[in-house]
């Protein structure tokens, strides 16, 4: 989660149904060969006598997709990429009144994801702005280059605790919804199952954070061969208050997400589109369309360490 407000709402929705961009991961192996090979999924739906697919089979498939995301998260740390965010600010009638774009290069610095702004409104930064971004990255590099062992241990323990909390949230997704097989569809040349999910009546959340699951419905497209999610379509079916009314997400908020296979080894984000309709601290309204694209994935050596901006060893 990068900043509060509108981005918080986007992050929250992505977390709920993407099964999941931010699901649990274990500490990264220093050698990609140490990451276990992904087994082929046993995706063979067996309808019951009435012709319906039992819920247990859907949940097995979705949990399998969640496990694949653990591997995706590990491998993502071996990549840099470019993210372009386009924000359309809307008036009360839904018409665009202002458009802004930000393009960022996303780097991995001592295991931390760090963003460097490289363009605004599709125009390169000025020399002064570029220098400021370079100084920001160098500050992060210096911080972790000189990090003590005890500080590093505390940082990793904190990150692991956060991952475990995220994992608890994600694990409830398969239990909190009733699923229906809509059919099959070809996306980017790949055959997918199309599965629809709606809140399960009477479900009792195990975690306080998962109470909001009943406020959403959606569809997920899952690759038949690899069990990876390919596309998501999520809608808020009720208004949601977040964090002691610090934010309120309105009914009808909508998000679409896509991911794609990179280097024949990992599935990573391709596109996210969000219709934001929310109010922050009961005062400031956010009525925006946000469109994010992810490109130029480049793999770097896992043993490399960035010791200065533009340098590795």
Q: Residue locations for each model-derived region?
A:
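Structured extracytoplasmic
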Residues: 26-217, 224-230, 235-253, 258-270, ...
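Bacterial N-terminal signal peptides that target proteins for export
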Residues: 1-11
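Generic short N-terminal amphipathic or hydrophobic helices
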Residues: 2-3, 15, 34-37
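Bacterial N-terminal signal peptides
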Residues: 9-20
């Amino acid at each position: 989660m990068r900043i509060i407000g509108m981005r918080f709402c986007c992050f929250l929705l992505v977390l709920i149904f993407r099964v999941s961009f931010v699901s649990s991961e274990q500490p990264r192996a220093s050698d990609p060969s140490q990451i276990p090979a992904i087994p082929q999924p046993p995706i063979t739906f067996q309808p019951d006598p009435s012709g319906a697919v039992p819920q247990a089979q859907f949940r097995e498939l979705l949990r399998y997709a969640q496990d694949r995301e653990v591997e995706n998260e590990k491998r993502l740390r071996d990549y840099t990429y470019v993210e372009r965010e386009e924000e359309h600010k809307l008036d009360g009638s839904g018409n665009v009144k202002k458009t802004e774009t930000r393009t960022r290069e996303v780097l991995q610095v001592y295991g931390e994801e760090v963003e460097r702004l490289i363009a605004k409104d599709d125009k390169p930064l000025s020399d002064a702005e570029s220098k400021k971004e370079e100084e920001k990255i160098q500050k992060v590099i210096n911080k972790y280059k000189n990090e003590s062992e005890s500080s590093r241990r505390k940082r990793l323990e904190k990150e692991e605790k956060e991952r475990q909390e995220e994992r608890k949230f994600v694990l409830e997704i398969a239990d909190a919804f009733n699923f229906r097989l809509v059919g099959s569809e070809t996306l980017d040349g790949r055959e997918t199952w199309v599965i629809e999910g709606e809140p399960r009546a009477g479900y009792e959340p195990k975690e306080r954070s998962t109470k909001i699951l009943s406020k959403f419905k959606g569809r997920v497209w899952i690759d038949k061969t690899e069990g990876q999610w390919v596309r998501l379509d999520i809608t808020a079916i009720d208004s949601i208050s977040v964090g002691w009314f610090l934010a309120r997400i309105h009914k009808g908020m909508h998000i679409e997400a896509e991911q794609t296979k990179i280097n024949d080894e990992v599935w990573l984000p391709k596109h996210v589109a969000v219709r934001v309709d929310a109010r922050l601290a009961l005062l400031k309204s956010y009525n925006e369309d946000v469109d994010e694209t992810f490109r130029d994935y480049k793999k770097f050596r896992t043993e490399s360490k960035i010791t200065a901006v533009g340098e590795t060893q």
